């Protein structure tokens, strides 16, 4: 919906960006089950630059608790191993030729609680990002109303719409967090 020079769909898009970033961050949290998304945040020093692991290797899940990383270029194996170790995912690479195998250890109760805390931190960062977008939208509405580009009634109605979008997005963040928390705590 667009009124004057205010487009609420742009705010929705920016808020959805925060939830997509949260999904990406939560996907990188280890839950005790192998998932190729665990390695998405891993950056490899390759050819003089930082590259995502998925640009230098193929990641597969041959078993529920095993990741297999097929490195395309033999000269990159050591760099990929180092990137995995440096990523603080708690994984120990075992190399056989051009294949790096990563056993996913069982999570103990203490580690599960730590991961839940990290997930909560990610979710709070997403909520803060959503609130910043809301504040930007409300500030824009106030400026438009002050400059007489929209009426006071329109400003209040649109502010209410912005709040509804904010509430829905924060609810989505909370649902993503609850699902990840359940996944982490399930033994």
Swiss-Prot record:
One of its GO terms (molecular function) is ribosomal large subunit binding. It comes from the Bacteria. Pfam families: RRF. GO terms for biological process: cytoplasmic translational termination. One of its GO terms (cellular component) is cytosol. It is found in: Cytoplasm. Its main location: cytoplasm. Keywords: Cytoplasm, Protein biosynthesis. Responsible for the release of ribosomes from messenger RNA at the termination of protein biosynthesis. May increase the efficiency of translation by recycling ribosomes from one round of translation to another. Belongs to the RRF family. HAMAP family: RRF (MF_00040). This is Ribosome-recycling factor. It comes from Rhodopseudomonas palustris (strain BisA53). The lineage of its organism: Bacteria, Pseudomonadati, Pseudomonadota, Alphaproteobacteria, Hyphomicrobiales.
